[in-house]
Amino acid sequence: MKILVFYIYLTFALLSPFIALFNQSADAREAENGSAAPDLAFGAYQRGDFKAALVEAKKRLQINPKDAAALALIGQLYIEGAGVNRDAKQAMDWFRRAADLGNAESAYIYGAALLQGLNVPKDRHRARDYLEKAAALNHGSALHLLGEMALENEGKPSDFSRALDYFKRADAAGNADASYALGVLYKTGKGLDKDLNTAAFYFKRAADLDLSAAMVEYAIMQFNGLGAPRDQQAAIALLRRAGMAGNAVAQNRLAHIYAEGLGIAPDLSQARYWRDKAREGGLADSALDFLSSVRGKDGLDKQELSAPTAPTQTKTQSIMPPTFQAPLKK
């Protein structure tokens, strides 16, 4: 049964792309490239002097044509249109060359692009090859995407065993989306025994990494004492954190909490505020039209636990590469 839906962010964001691509020390780059020269290319990029960054990166390639980090930097400049005319297709060629020389981030970017046919011909098999290159270097996002591919499995029954392996490796590498995916699998009992305690554990790991969808899931479990110790005040605080990050589901839950006085004193002003924020985020709720009470006072309705969580870009999701989110259908 096909249970995976891809929510794909295809825009290459400009927020901290240097950190996303080149989170290596100067010593590590020197060891990789066999060069002890000052890192003029990356220094220029960080200063915003993109034309100088391109010149210096090309100088590095003249010295060492196999300088994968310099190749990746040029790809970054072309994908941004920083110091050059934006040319996504040319950027992909630079990323491919860097990937072929062992640059993990470039292998992930190019593999993800191949998977979707983004500025390159769509090719699922080559995509897997490049993602596996990145995964072999413990790239968390590549491992997570391979896990999602195992669930989607080209329309065939999901390969849960393979997906779990990828997700757990990605989780160990600190990938929030993988932690969230594991939480969903344990919560729904897809491919393994249902275990709310373990689900809550993984949702909390993802929430601690600022993934707002996971904040919502963990907060609801915490509010109801399902899989996590009941703590309504902490749950409300976590929902506020997710709501302030722009998660419409969190905003909707907060509106109900304030309207009905669940765990706190009723506050219709706050209820209206969060209801309106959720509407702005695309989540309308007729039950809140007049802030009417639709749930009991003992906790959030069981329906809350199965409500879909709207994907919302967070710090971990707004970096340069295409990010694939996959809320699972029951």
Residues covered by each model-derived region:
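Structural signature of tandem alpha-helical TPR/SEL1-like repeats
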Residues: G48-V55, N85-W94, P121-Y130, P157-Y166, ...
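Hydrophobic face of amphipathic alpha-helices that form TPR/SEL1-like repeat modules
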Residues: A37-A44, E56, R60, L71-E80, ...
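Short helix-capping/linker turns of helical repeat alpha-solenoids
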Residues: E32, I63-K66, E80-A82, L101-N103, ...
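Bacterial N-terminal signal peptides
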Residues: Y7-A20
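Canonical positions in the second alpha-helix
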Residues: K59-R60, R97-A98, K133-A134, R169-A170, ...
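TPR-adjacent "capping" and linker segments in tetratricopeptide-repeat scaffold/adaptor proteins
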Residues: D27-A36
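Terminal, low-structured helical/coil segments at or just beyond the last alpha-helical repeat
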Residues: G34, A265-K330
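Ankyrin-repeat and related helical/solenoid repeat scaffolds used for protein-protein interactions
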Residues: V216-G281
